[in-house]
Amino acid sequence: MAIKVLVVDDSSFFRRRVSEIINSDPRLEVIDVAVNGKEAVEKAKSLKPDVITMDIEMPVMDGISAVREIMKACPTPTLMFSSLTHDGAKATLDALDAGALDFLPKKFEDIARNRDEAVSLLQKRIAEIARKKSFMRRPVLSSQSTSTVESRTATTRTATSALTASPVKAAPAAPIAQRFKATGKKYQLTAIGTSTGGPVALQKILTAIPANYPHPIILVQHMPATFTAAFAARLNNLCKIQVKEAEDGDVLKPGCAYLAPGGLQMMVDGRPGASRLKILDGGERMNYKPCVDVTFGSAAKVYGDKVLSMILTGMGADGREGCRMLKAGGATIWSQDEQSCVVYGMPQAVDKAGLSSESLPLDRIAERMLVEVGLK
């Protein structure tokens, strides 16, 4: 049975273009289109599509407001289309706040080297997020995120809302929650890699990390160049630790998280306790910029067994080879479990390779980190 898709955009050209791409895949079928957010909400309720593709800027009701309404009334996996501008980045992050699962640039040439590759990517994204329909739930205000915002200085920090919805249902609670025990290993660096679903996952984890976290955190999120600065600023507004977009020459400091800039590669250089970040173009050899494999591989060379690493939700297998290098050096590797992933691709690749020592639900990863580093 084909995956039913509702296409929402005020541009007739874009509706037609997206519909043609979707309908060219036998797994997918466009069941209707909507020209604004209000119409999208109505059709989502009546047609119950498996996936919605949603523009952000539309008359009558914008895409962000529409996503909020849809998540309240009939939670549906939603893929946003966004412009690659600073304002577009902020709006896209707001849409993820509201419950959208993923996003793609409206200019397909910005996401692939040729048309066929772009078409395939869009089709794959729709097919992947459709699998999460049965796990969708309504957004719930996160008291943790609220208190975190209040704990930071005012001004613009309070203007940025928390990612209030986890788009997938957490694993069913056991009668008695598992109690974690530290392994006793000593760490000097935490490394996290993620892709699809990563913005929500990273915020969930990082907002629970205290300011006295004992070592630096490096973050690799597959994201366009214009998005990473806005995402780092948003995280910094919400977290007790400092979060910044990484710059060439940054000295790694405890209690600070460094987000790899989009369109570039981030590498760790130096020696433990005196390491810096190198930001490079990296050429076209790698499929991803930033690439988890590149960053994790460099961390393995510098920090060896002193790395606590995690692979979170994401499509593909980026991170597997970097984790292989980390594992060879004695580092610790965890993965996000299948049920809490938006896309169980990157964690699955690590799990199947036998590289992960623990598979954890998203809502307990921060707790596990704090236990492991002796803060809980």
Swiss-Prot record:
Organism expressing this protein natively: Aliivibrio fischeri (strain ATCC 700601 / ES114) (Vibrio fischeri)
PANTHER family in UniProt: PROTEIN-GLUTAMATE METHYLESTERASE/PROTEIN-GLUTAMINE GLUTAMINASE, PROTEIN-GLUTAMATE METHYLESTERASE_PROTEIN-GLUTAMINE GLUTAMINASE 1
Keywords: Chemotaxis, Cytoplasm, Hydrolase, Phosphoprotein
Annotated SUPFAM superfamilies: CheY-like (SSF52172), Methylesterase CheB, C-terminal domain (SSF52738)
Compositional bias segments (type: Low complexity): 145-161
CheB-type methylesterase domain ranges (all copies): 183-376
Active-site residue numbers: S195, H222, D318
Domain remarks: Contains a C-terminal catalytic domain, and an N-terminal region which modulates catalytic activity.
InterPro entries with a match to the protein in the record: CheB-like, CheB_C, CheY-like_superfamily, Sig_transdc_resp-reg_Me-estase, Sig_transdc_resp-reg_receiver
One MF term in the entry's GO annotations: protein-glutamate methylesterase activity
Recorded family membership: Belongs to the CheB family.
Protein's cellular compartments: Cytoplasm
Pfam family, one: Response_reg
Post-translational modifications reported in the UniProt record: Phosphorylated by CheA. Phosphorylation of the N-terminal regulatory domain activates the methylesterase activity.
Catalytic activity field: [protein]-L-glutamate 5-O-methyl ester + H2O = L-glutamyl-[protein] + methanol + H(+); L-glutaminyl-[protein] + H2O = L-glutamyl-[protein] + NH4(+)
A single GO cellular-component term on record: cytoplasm
Enzyme class: hydrolase
Domain Response regulatory: 4-121
Name the UniProt record assigns to this protein: Protein-glutamate methylesterase/protein-glutamine glutaminase
Record GO biological process: chemotaxis
Role according to the record: Involved in chemotaxis. Part of a chemotaxis signal transduction system that modulates chemotaxis in response to various stimuli. Catalyzes the demethylation of specific methylglutamate residues introduced into the chemoreceptors (methyl-accepting chemotaxis proteins or MCP) by CheR. Also mediates the irreversible deamidation of specific glutamine residues to glutamic acid.
EC code: 3.1.1.61, 3.5.1.44
Main location: cytoplasm
